């Protein structure tokens, strides 16, 4: 059978954060709180512009970009806290949903596992039956062969006895 056995590692659920790799997890978190990545990008841009103005020697713009950086970091922090507060209620609902999904997934895996065991059991029973049938056929063929061989050996022995009896009769007649 080339069919694969069910496994506890089959498939990935959207809510299964433990089974996600780092990029999938980042994308999932960005979808949950979309303002945080925007704040991070804005902060990074402000730092980049501040670095550029430092190289030019422009102190006024450097101070302005560093102030923007602080403002963007504050906005990111506020978005993070507000998003955490807003998603806390949703998180509890997600936990309940995740538990239900995991229970359903476990039931499906158990059902698939039981079906696979039943298939294997049926295959084993059919192999056993074929083996018993072929063994019975082999025994029957052997019996028939032995009976046929016995007939031939009996016929040969009878022919030898008849020859020896005829030979003895000829010796008696000649004496």
Swiss-Prot record:
Keyword Calcium in annotation: no
According to the entry, every stretch annotated as the HIG1 domain falls at 7-98
* Gene Ontology CC, one term: respiratory chain complex
Give the transmembrane region(s).
34-54, 70-90
Renumbered to this chain, region (Disordered) spans: 147-175
Q: Where is the signal peptide?
A: none
Q: Write out the GO biological process terms.
A: mitochondrial cytochrome c oxidase assembly; mitochondrial respirasome assembly; regulation of proton transport
PROSITE patterns from the xrefs?
Answer: HIG1
Q: Where in the cell is it found?
A: Mitochondrion membrane
The record's principal subcellular location, in a coarse class, is mitochondrion
Membrane topology qualifier: Multi-pass membrane protein
Q: Which domain of life is it from?
A: Eukaryota
Pfam (any one): HIG_1_N
What positions belong to coiled-coil segments? 90-144
**Database matches in InterPro entries:** Hypoxia_induced_domain, RCF1
Oligomeric state and partners?
Associates with the respiratory chain complex III/complex IV supercomplex.
- What does the similarity note say? Belongs to the RCF1 family.
Protein function: Cytochrome c oxidase subunit which plays a role in assembly of respiratory supercomplexes.
Protein name, UniProt field = Respiratory supercomplex factor 1, mitochondrial
Q: What is the lineage of its organism?
A: Eukaryota, Fungi, Dikarya, Ascomycota, Saccharomycotina
């Amino acid at each position: 059978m080339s069919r694969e056995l069910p496994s506890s590692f089959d498939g990935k659920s959207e809510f299964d954060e433990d089974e996600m790799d780092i990029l999938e997890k980042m994308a999932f978190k960005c979808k949950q709180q979309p303002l945080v990545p925007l704040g991070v990008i804005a902060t990074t841009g402000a730092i980049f512009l501040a670095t550029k103005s430092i190289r030019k020697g422009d102190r006024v713009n450097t101070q302005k970009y560093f102030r923007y950086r602080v403002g963007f970091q504050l906005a990111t922090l506020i978005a993070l806290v507000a998003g955490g507060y807003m998603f806390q209620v949703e998180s509890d609902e997600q936990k309940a949903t995740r538990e239900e999904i995991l229970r359903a997934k476990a039931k499906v895996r158990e059902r698939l596992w039981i079906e696979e065991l039943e298939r294997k059991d049926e295959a084993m029973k059919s192999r056993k039956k074929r083996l018993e049938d072929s063994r019975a056929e082999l025994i029957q063929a052997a019996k028939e062969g032995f009976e046929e061989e016995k007939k031939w050996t009996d016929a040969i022995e009878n022919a030898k006895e008849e020859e020896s009896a005829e030979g003895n009769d000829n010796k008696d007649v000649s004496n």
